[in-house]
Amino acid sequence: MASVDELQKKIKELEAKLAAVEAKGGPMRQKIEVMSSEVVDSNPYSRLMALKRMGIVNNYEQIREKTVAVVGVGGVGSVTAEMLTRCGIGKLILFDYDKVELANMNRLFFQPHQAGLSKVDAAAATLQNINPDVTIDAYNYNITTVDNFQKFCDTISKGSLTGGAVDLVLSCVDNFEARMAINTACNELDQKWFESGVSENAVSGHIQFISPGESACFACAPPLVVATKVDERTLKREGVCAASLPTTMGIVAGFLVQNSLKYLLEFGNVTHYLGYSALTDFFPTMSLQPNPTCDDASCRARQEQRRLQPRVELAAEVTEDCGPVHQDNDWGISVLEENSPADEDCPGLKLVDGVQVAYSIPVDSSTPESSTGGAVAASELSLEDLMQQMKTM
């Protein structure tokens, strides 16, 4: 028989679910079968489709064919899932085993009436109301356990809309154990993924794109806690928690989704590593090469596979010099050769090949040579006589 505490806990969960149902309010909009660029108030995709009209994205409709797995539906993960949902992603798979608490309310997305619900269920209900066109699967379990790890691998390898592997995995977890589990799974499955994180003091964060065998995985250069194999749970103290700013988490989530869209829709450049320091507004970027002696055997195997693949050399695009667009004009403007700056614009300046001046260098008119065109004429006067003449001027 259940204890009083268990029954009270169950009552709270049922009350939370009832509050969530009541909060849904009016009916959801009807599903939209085809994305349209028509600019009307009732079209939620018109501004997204404008990216296609402006030449940023070739085919935005492809996003409805994509499947993304979000692991961790906390401060970063919930906002990431919301952004992807609003962008019209085809399918979203959510993983988390935690429950919504009132302490989560500073992290955006979740609402007080959802306290007590599992994060994935609360997120799925809210996201489905935002965009009913998105297929959402929610998995409420810890991926780091042996049994659940295999379930996780099966889901990301067969959970797409077509029954194959997902297009991208986004790690939004807050511990190294879960990151290592995602890293292991993606290395084994040759699955591309993004790792993200926010510092404990909430004023810095990062995202990292990981392509097994091509870029450094999470085990190639692990944090000290991972490298020394310390149990993270022993580092946590009662009554002490990490700081959390919704601004920092929103920024990191924005970077994460922005680069995910660039990868999925093939536009722009995907950043391999992007950091963020809120105190100095510093955004470092870099590329990380895989470690040949990585502890992860699957990572080393993927590196060997990439090494044996024939390199594809891209032919250089040859463009024809068409000259100035408007050679003749009504304003008397003439165009000089870009690689031949006029000599009079930069007297005495020697430029190496490929270097141009951005402006003309002014001649110093204060020197006698510049004003008279030669040296000052010799004078028989002494220094005292010259000073006396200057005083009388």
Curated annotation (Swiss-Prot):
Q: Where does Zn(2+) bind?
A: C217, C220, C294, C299
Q: Does the keyword Zinc apply?
A: yes
Q: What does this protein do?
A: E1-like enzyme which activates UFM1.
Q: Where are the transmembrane segments?
A: none
Name recorded for this polypeptide: Ubiquitin-like modifier-activating enzyme 5
Q: Which domain of life is it from?
A: Eukaryota
Q: Which GO terms describe its molecular function?
A: ATP binding; metal ion binding; UFM1 activating enzyme activity
Q: Which species is the source of this protein? A: Bombyx mori
Alphabetically list the UniProt keywords: ATP-binding, Metal-binding, Nucleotide-binding, Ubl conjugation pathway, Zinc
Kindly indicate whether the keyword Metal-binding belongs to this entry: yes
Q: Which residues form the active site?
A: C241
Positions of ATP binding: G75, D96, K119, N142, N175
GO BP terms: protein ufmylation
